[in-house]
């Protein structure tokens, strides 16, 4: 599908474009002169079920043709390369486990928070764990943060952080979905570096806002037949805007930061 090049294949669509429609049109155009089975060899990785359904609907609208293999980011962990990675625990089970641990902490330290906040605290810790695992940030890195005059509040927060630490590193607890996804991406990156897929792999619709997804995008972009298609890319951003993105404190939430 792609001619050999020395640069990474990174494409983008501008804000306001009908991303699935333009994506399908581009794939069809690139395969006009190729054998019918060429499109069926393509693996198209997208980040939401809604986009996957829309892409499939656009192909189903005709004309009849062989279709690419459409996968979600989370489907990548279902292949033989990652069969030995344990399945992730359900989000509900993890929240119930966190609720029990938070309850025990509040029993020992009743001044930390009211009992009525038990479930909210468990939800907050679950969200924190997802973000930490998605970014590859261990609890030790957060514990070492210099928070200055917030030391009293921070000391209380660290007691809750110790609960999160229970689920990091070697433990008897099952993997969270984010932790498993990171292991899957690390495994695929290693396998692909040794034996790259011969067929095209296209990751479309992701910006790399999560660390795990960014790592996957980097791995795909390095493949001989890999490509990225970015959504909502601002091709008109001035040079000064690109310079501003180098400041993580002010630009981290920008979709083109990474």
Name each model-derived stretch:
Residues 197-209:
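Conserved P-loop NTPase "ATPase switch" module shared by AAA+ and STAND
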Residues 1-31:
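N- or domain-start disorder-to-order transition segments that initiate the globular core
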Residues 46-196, 211, 218, 224-225, ...:
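Basic/charged alpha-beta structural segments of nucleotide/phosphate-handling enzymes
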Residues 27-34, 188-192:
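Structural motif corresponding to the C-terminal cap of alpha-helices
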Residues 40-43, 200:
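Short active-site oxyanion
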């Amino acid at each position: 599908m792609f001619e050999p090049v020395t640069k990474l294949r990174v494409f983008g669509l501008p804000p306001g474009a009908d991303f699935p429609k333009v994506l399908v049109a581009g794939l069809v155009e690139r395969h006009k002169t190729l054998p019918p089975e060429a499109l069926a060899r393509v693996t198209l990785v997208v980040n939401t079920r809604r986009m996957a359904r829309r892409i499939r609907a656009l192909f189903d609208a005709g004309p009849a043709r062989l279709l690419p293999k459409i996968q979600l980011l989370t489907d990548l962990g279902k292949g033989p390369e990652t069969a030995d990675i344990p399945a992730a625990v359900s989000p509900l089970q993890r929240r119930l486990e966190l609720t029990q641990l938070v309850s025990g902490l509040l029993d020992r330290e009743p001044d930390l928070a009211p009992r009525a906040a038990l479930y909210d605290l468990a939800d907050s810790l679950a969200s924190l764990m997802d973000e930490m695992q998605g970014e590859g940030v261990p609890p030790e890195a957060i514990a070492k943060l210099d928070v200055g005059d917030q030391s009293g509040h921070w000391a209380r927060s660290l007691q809750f952080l110790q609960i999160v630490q229970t689920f990091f590193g070697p433990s008897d607890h099952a993997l969270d979905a984010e932790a498993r996804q990171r292991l899957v991406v690390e495994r695929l990156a290693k396998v692909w570096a040794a034996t790259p897929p011969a067929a095209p792999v296209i990751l479309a619709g992701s910006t790399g806002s999560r660390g795990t997804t960014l790592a996957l995008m980097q791995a795909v972009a390095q493949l001989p037949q890999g490509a990225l298609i970015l959504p909502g890319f601002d091709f008109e951003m001035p040079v000064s805007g690109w310079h501003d993105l180098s400041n993580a404190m002010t630009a981290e939430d920008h979709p083109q930061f990474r």
